[in-house]
């Protein structure tokens, strides 16, 4: 499974890239979706490669994403009661199901887009590809480090500090 994050906004967006980001439901900066690694999705990602970054998601990072940021319809946090409604006993079991190919949009009442904070320490240059010490494009397993930097602890979903 691939994690795809939008890193640039709407201004100056090429029409093909705009259509691709709409199809992926990536309508805002720092939003994340999880997609399968198929030729169709790879073609879409290459079309919008200047505005997105993506890579292979590992199970530990996926569990962290589900625990901290996944939302049910109505902005309800994903808790043990909601997980049981979806037919799983734990977040780990749900993460296994997603890693085996099930998409977030396949789950009833689960929001398919995960909202993240900007990364701690900021992005590298968003205008350059990852291979040239930038942020856009394919980054492989390093996407997990970026996601962990974007899961800032201490901030509630409503934007208020827990302290």
Swiss-Prot record:
InterPro entries tied to this protein: Ribo_uL30_ferredoxin-like_sf, Ribosomal_uL30, Ribosomal_uL30_arc, Ribosomal_uL30_euk_arc, Ribosomal_uL30_ferredoxin-like
Keyword annotations from UniProtKB, A to Z: Ribonucleoprotein, Ribosomal protein
Pfam families given in the database record: Ribosomal_L30
CDD domains: Ribosomal_L7_archeal_euk (cd01657)
GO biological processes: maturation of LSU-rRNA from tricistronic rRNA transcript (SSU-rRNA, 5.8S rRNA, LSU-rRNA); translation
Gene3D superfamilies named among the record's database cross-references: 1.10.15.30, Ribosomal protein L30, ferredoxin-like fold domain
Domain of life per record: Archaea
Ribosomal protein keyword on record: yes
A Gene Ontology molecular function term of the record: RNA binding
GO CC terms in record: cytosolic large ribosomal subunit
Subunit organization: Part of the 50S ribosomal subunit.
Family: Belongs to the universal ribosomal protein uL30 family.
Record-given protein name: Large ribosomal subunit protein uL30
Source organism per UniProt: Picrophilus torridus (strain ATCC 700027 / DSM 9790 / JCM 10055 / NBRC 100828 / KAW 2/3)
């Amino acid at each position: 499974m691939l994690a795809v994050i939008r890193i640039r906004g709407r201004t100056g967006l090429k029409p093909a890239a705009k259509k691709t980001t709409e199809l992926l439901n990536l309508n805002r900066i720092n939003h994340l979706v999880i997609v399968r690694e198929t030729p169709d999705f790879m073609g879409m990602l290459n079309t919008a490669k200047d505005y997105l970054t993506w890579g292979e998601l590992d199970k530990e990072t996926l569990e962290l994403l589900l625990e901290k940021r996944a939302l049910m319809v109505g902005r309800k946090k994903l808790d043990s009661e909601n997980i049981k409604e979806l037919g799983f006993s734990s977040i780990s079991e749900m993460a296994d199901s997603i890693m085996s190919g099930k998409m977030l949009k396949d789950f009833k009442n689960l929001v398919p887009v995960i909202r993240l904070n900007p990364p701690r320490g900021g992005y590298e240059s968003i205008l350059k590809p990852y291979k040239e010490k930038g942020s856009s494009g394919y980054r492989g397993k390093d996407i997990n480090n970026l996601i962990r930097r974007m899961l800032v602890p201490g901030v509630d979903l409503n934007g208020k500090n827990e302290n």
